Amino acid sequence: MEKTPAETTAVSAGNVPRDSIPCITNVSADTRGRTRPSRPATVPQRRPARIGHFRRRSASLSFLDWPDDSVTEGVRTTSASVAASAARFDEIRRRRQSINDEMKERTLEDALAVELVNETFRCSVTSDARKDLQKLVRRVSGTVLRLSWPNGWFFTYCDLLRVGYFGHLNIKGLEKTFLCCDKFLLPVGTVSRCEAIGRPPLPVLIGEGGRVYVYSPVVESLYLVSRSGFRGFVQEGLRNYAPLREELGYVRFETGGDVGREFMLARDLLALWRLCMKREGSIFSWRDGNEALTTVVLNGSQTYEDPAHGNWLKETCSLNVLQVFVVRAVPVESQQRLDISILVNESGAVFGVHPDTRQAHFLARGLLGFFRVGFLRFCNNYCFARDCFTHPESVAPAYRATGCPRELFCRRLRKKKGLFARR
């Protein structure tokens, strides 16, 4: 194949054919910022190389510092602007490095916290859980973990066996004092708010099966806060600790909020009775978690006419109770929805009546706390007072625990049914 005159001229000049030259542009700049003169008209101008060569060339030269546009335009760069630009880039580099270091530190802390939580859970479900937990707590005593709720609350590993926190209680026999048939109950730390003043920390205990409890020193009772072990406790926080929900929770009304607020402001049974006469048949709704609950206010005559009124007085150990309203379609366990009547006694305590058994169950210490905590305690009251299983008559029926925390695996229940009897 014969060559064209242009290719003959290029080869004779000692140049390589233009299609194989990986050049990027025909204009180059010298170190002083001036543009070189173009080639003579007799030499044909080279066009950019093929796209494949261009990509390889640009990739191989990506590490080079190409001159700014000001250089190509013939503008001189002063030493002051260079220094300012260098200082600016140094500051950006330092900030980026500090952010990266902080992110790495947080990631490391989170990873260590997750590993510690998992190790605590593993120790709580071993065959020798009490001894394994004691060793772990003494090794990591003072370590702090952040809880998901409430905001600003922390869990701190602490060896309460050596501190003597429980004083007169026999800490080695706490499971016999408060629980039904658990083999051990060991304190592993406390929960508190870092800036709280005058609020005593709440001890956290782990029982058989990894279940987590919180001890309330005010009423000397244990509250079951996590059935899924220590990992569930850290993830859920104290959402299942009803006294704290009553104190720190919030009320959300959907409709008829003015009616609900009037009930929260009522001070005694007489004020509630007058409010029922005034708001007879009124409907308002509020949210309990993700559920919107519709509430119907009863009239004054219905507050005392229920045949079970005398039984409610005995079950709640009250001098007087008032049936104020009915909450419709409340979701309970086993995917049931019930219409629950709400009772209030002379001290302001709130109770819910199961529609099937007509028994009263304690819900909250007041109507404000009831709208905050909702039906968390309804048929789910795992609050264990001292000797509540050995002497159940010491606790009023409405305040008694729903049952053993082991539920169907309760050793006393299985022994009573003869499940352990030899055939």
UniProtKB/Swiss-Prot annotation:
Alphabetical list of InterPro entries matching this protein: US22-like (IPR003360)
GO CC annotation terms, alphabetical: viral tegument
Region (Disordered): 1-46
Subcellular localization, as worded in the UniProt entry: Virion tegument
Coiled-coil residue spans: none
Compositional bias per record (Polar residues), positions renumbered to this chain: 1-12
Major localisation: virion
Keyword set, alphabetical order: Virion, Virion tegument
Family, as annotated: Belongs to the herpesviridae US22 family.
Name of the protein: Tegument protein UL43
